[in-house]
């Protein structure tokens, strides 16, 4: 007996990924301080270039905005990326981007991108230690 249902869905691995960096700690305790995301000003329609990058959110946004090395890295890595988010959860703080196509993995995990995520994680850790 054949199943000719129009509602058949295929499941399985999809060719998308999401980059997550995790800082362990009581993230919920610092929710107001650590919730943040990047914003950017882009120039051009077809050949886009990032002119400026800044952070919006809690106390951490002030620190991240004052880090000139991080800003330089973000301008170069966010030209192809969406925003970066900092999200405190129950027992950690997640630093992540939106879902990406699997074929772009090496471009989104460049040396500069990993350095930027490490700088962000360092700022997260320092705020968590400061306000414990």
Regions found by a protein language model. Name each.
Residues 1-7:
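Short N-terminal edge-element motif at the start of the domain
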Residues 10-16, 22-132:
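Charged, low-complexity intrinsically disordered regions
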């Amino acid at each position: 007996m054949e199943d000719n249902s129009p509602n058949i869905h295929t499941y399985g691995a999809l060719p998308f990924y999401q980059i997550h960096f995790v800082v362990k700690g009581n993230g919920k305790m610092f929710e107001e301080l650590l919730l943040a995301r990047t914003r950017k000003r882009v120039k051009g329609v077809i050949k886009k270039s990032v002119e400026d990058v800044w952070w919006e959110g809690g106390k951490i946004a002030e620190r991240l905005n004052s880090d000139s090395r991080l800003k330089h890295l973000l301008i170069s890595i966010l030209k192809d990326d969406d925003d970066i988010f900092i999200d405190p959860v129950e027992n950690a703080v997640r630093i992540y981007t939106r879902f990406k196509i699997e074929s772009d993995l090496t471009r989104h995990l460049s040396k500069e991108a990993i350095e930027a995520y490490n700088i962000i994680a360092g700022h997260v850790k320092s705020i968590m230690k400061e306000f414990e």
